[in-house]
Amino acid sequence: MTGKTQTSNVTNKNDPKSINSRVFIGNLNTAIVKKVDIEAIFSKYGKIVGCSVHKGYAFVQYMSERHARAAVAGENARIIAGQPLDINMAGEPKPYRPKPGNKRPISALYRLESKEPFLSVGGYVFDYDYYRDDFYNRLFDYHGRVPPPPRAVIPLKRPRAAVTTTRRGKGVFSMKGGSRSAVSGSSSSGSKLKSDELQTIKKELTQIKTKIDSLLGRLEKIEKQQKAEAEAQKKQLEASLELIQDECVSENADHSAEEPAEGAPDADGEELTDGVEEDFDEDGAHELFLQIK
């Protein structure tokens, strides 16, 4: 990226028009991005009358405030040389947000001598380094808020027998042997923990199994008892039915035996009355026959 013409390096005029039309560019990789590159990028928003590049930041002076605001809106957060730019109006500094335990006094915003002063208040001028520090503080705050990426889970390897070597005449363990022993110790402790967990789980499962078996045995006993009770009740009902049937049969037999005994006197009486009537008829006929004679 190259520009056609280079502008002046003056970006520290104190008149209100210049202050309101000046753009601050923070988080700039000045080791790669040069002045001509900045002019080429920001010249599309309007005429540039001044451009100064410093370590980590730069200033661009436009002819009008409208061009400066358009550049801020269009180029803010743009990534150049691997870094997102922090662009804002130089005459509208953002409030300083210090980290806890690292407070910056208000007097630090002003100094008597400045490399690039742009606003004078009572003999003091704003410190442009304040913009740079503010940007980096905000950048670090952002990185602090972003959670780190999750680490990959490294599978445990089999513990190997750590063979330590010693120098002749000196009882000093080698670094490799020590690291291997540490790794083997950690892996063995991990395997012990796993075996303990497995043992506890196995015990719990066996306890649960015994409980289930006992419950099943109880259920089987209850079912057998219910079946036995049902069979006993069934037998009792059958026996009672048989007794009732036997009683009914015996009663019927008794009734059938009593009926002829009761009817015998009636038959004899009928025969007697019939004989008397016949005798009476014969006597009356004989008397009538005698009278006729």
Swiss-Prot record:
GO molecular function: RNA binding
Domain called RRM: residue spans: 21-92
UniProt feature, compositional bias: Low complexity: 176-192
Regions of compositional bias (Acidic residues) in chain numbering: 259-284
Recorded GO CC terms: nucleus
Region annotated Disordered, chain positions: 159-195, 245-293
Coiled coil: 192-254
Keywords: Coiled coil, RNA-binding
Record-stated family: Belongs to the RRM HNRPC family. RALY subfamily.
Matching PANTHER family: HETEROGENEOUS NUCLEAR RIBONUCLEOPROTEIN (PTHR13968), RNA-BINDING RALY-LIKE PROTEIN (PTHR13968:SF21)
Protein name: RNA-binding Raly-like protein
Organism: Bos taurus
Gene that this sequence comes from: RALYL
